């Protein structure tokens, strides 16, 4: 017995290979998909209403992925909607496994990638303020900038959160200074607890490398919510941390021994001194000169 057919990789069901880390990665993706959406990635309406043979064919990957952006022939009207229960990052990881990874085993999302994406997703949820609901949902504004609970349609107050961004630079040749080329949002973190520990996987991509430079996940800084509802920045590990208050140009280091720094919307938090990038020797062809920062929203 190699496993339950519903969770087995197609190449296992076809008896092409023995179980390995790639088939395990596929099975994990199916289980996570089922936990979130209450369904199988290849069992849409055209299979759900079909024969047992069609269901077996679906487990073999002979039907399109339910959330395939290029075709909607196998969509499900019975599963929980993807945009309600998963972040964009999780959606992309599922697509990698069930579209590209269906035939190319090397493309399948790893357990570590899923673990980090699930960690990030767990920090993006908020609790509905409707006392008759109190369900959790991914904090995401609609076109009217409202935070509507998908379970009861209650309009919730806008939460405080950190928006992490990556900033790219190119050089002004004549002034020997840098100008902003691109700001790309990467992660969000909802500040919902009395103590919000932000881990280093939000600060750097070093955690995903499979080499000697990999870093274990640990708390990088903390944001505490006081009884008066205000938020305060704390640097418990004395990591490199700077803040630029809204409507100011001054960068202030935040050190372990310092008093907590009150945070307001639009304050900027940096994880290295941003002023050092003004002095780098780059030219107009340079790309990838990058640092990450967070905006209090």
Name each region found by the language model.
Residues 1-15:
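Conserved activation segment of eukaryotic-like protein kinases, specifically the C-terminal portion
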Residues 13-28, 137-139:
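Repeat-solenoid scaffold signature
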Residues 20-26, 32-91:
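Conserved C-lobe activation region of Hanks-type protein kinase-like domains
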Residues 95-125:
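Terminal C-lobe "cap" of eukaryotic-type protein kinase domains
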Residues 113-119, 123-211, 218:
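Regulatory extensions appended to serine/threonine kinase catalytic cores
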Residues 233-237:
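Asparagine-centered strand-capping/turn motif at beta-strand->loop junctions
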Residues 239-242:
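Short, solvent-exposed loop/linker segments at beta-strand-coil boundaries, enriched for Pro/Gly
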Residues 244-297:
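C-terminal boundary/linker segments immediately following FHA domains
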